[in-house]
Amino acid sequence: MVQENKNFATAQAKSIRVSSRKLNLVAAFIRNMKVSEALVQLTFSPKRIAKVVKDCLQSAVANAENNLGLDIDRLVITKATVGKALVMKRVMPRAKGRATRINKFFSNLYITVTEKEDN
């Protein structure tokens, strides 16, 4: 059996209380960015969801360092994928006895970091 040299680590955050469209704005922003630069950008981002993305990214970095022994300074975010999760359906009373439906969207976030060679 041939064993591959694994040089990437992943982390995931599931059932985040934000729509996938809003989460994808932040995920697309950090995609293909160096981890150190992405952490600075997420720290000072005005988006509410940036804190959750930062926590997930720090988890991926910790997985890379502790489980695989990768060098933190050479890590790059290769994948930042967003997926839809459940939708909570709620009812809001309106005028004249009517009611409308409110959808509360949840999302999943998957981050993969890879160690890149210095050129």
UniProtKB/Swiss-Prot annotation:
GO molecular function: rRNA binding; structural constituent of ribosome
Domain of life, per lineage: Bacteria
Gene3D superfamilies according to UniProt: Ribosomal protein L22/L17
UniProtKB keywords: Ribonucleoprotein, Ribosomal protein, RNA-binding, rRNA-binding
GO terms under biological process: translation
GO cellular component: cytosolic large ribosomal subunit
UniProt keyword RNA-binding, yes or no: yes
Subunit text: Part of the 50S ribosomal subunit.
Primary role: This protein binds specifically to 23S rRNA; its binding is stimulated by other ribosomal proteins, e.g. L4, L17, and L20. It is important during the early stages of 50S assembly. It makes multiple contacts with different domains of the 23S rRNA in the assembled 50S subunit and ribosome.
Family to which this protein belongs: Belongs to the universal ribosomal protein uL22 family.
UniProt protein name: Large ribosomal subunit protein uL22
Source organism of this protein record: Rickettsia rickettsii (strain Sheila Smith)
